[in-house]
Amino acid sequence: MATDARLGVQKALKSRQKAIQADLAEEERLEAMLSYEKALYKEGYQAIAGIDEVGRGPLAGPVVAACVILPQHCKIKGLNDSKKIPKSKHETIYQAVKEKALAIGIGIIDNQLIDEVNIYEATKLAMLEAIKQLEGQLTQPDYLLIDAMTLDIAISQQSILKGDANSLSIAAASIVAKVTRDQMMANYDRIFPGYGFAKNAGYGTKEHLQGLKAYGITPIHRKSFEPVKSMCCDSTNP
């Protein structure tokens, strides 16, 4: 019995040590992701906004961008590039960002405008709209950290390659944009069943492509994206 007790204590200690090590590793990761922000604070900037988008590649639905200003030195456990966060944790981290953020703006550009101007320009428009949504909020950005994009706007900015994995502010924008768009696609799934929008978010999965063949194109499909584009041509040229 005494041996069993000692083993139990040893296991508990090892488990606690692992938890402490994991917490330290997470603290170091988050600290590293604040390197851009800390350098800008030293330069005198006060309100640094991270900007990112979600939805450039899907065959259906909008492109969504978010602009998020976090308090100085704010750390949110688990916050990372939204593609690296388990889907089961998206909502929890999204809510944590909403609670801690000083300001949040969201820009949504629908599939029709994407078809008109192309996805690259539509992404820029979504980002600019997200920034515009901050107007009227108490905190206004004096610097922008943008994921791999440069914007035509009179605010100091820096484009960061893989910014959502290297800047906590951009990562915050990434999860806000991701959850916002996923919620929209889940709603579209109820309106247009048979394409699996709630699961695939409009990307060209097997289920989505089968839905296109079985039911045709919906009003939210991007007609400038293949294979939707070819299907449009086929329907106009019987």
UniProtKB/Swiss-Prot annotation:
It is found in: Cytoplasm. A divalent metal cation binds at D52, E53, D147. SUPFAM superfamilies: Ribonuclease H-like. GO terms for cellular component: cytoplasm; ribonuclease H2 complex. One of its GO terms (biological process) is DNA replication, removal of RNA primer. Its EC number is 3.1.26.4. Manganese or magnesium. Binds 1 divalent metal ion per monomer in the absence of substrate. May bind a second metal ion after substrate binding. GO terms for molecular function: manganese ion binding; RNA binding; RNA-DNA hybrid ribonuclease activity. Its main location: cytoplasm. Keywords: Cytoplasm, Endonuclease, Hydrolase, Manganese, Metal-binding, Nuclease. The keyword Nuclease applies. Endonuclease that specifically degrades the RNA of RNA-DNA hybrids. Belongs to the RNase HII family. This is Ribonuclease HII. The gene is rnhB.
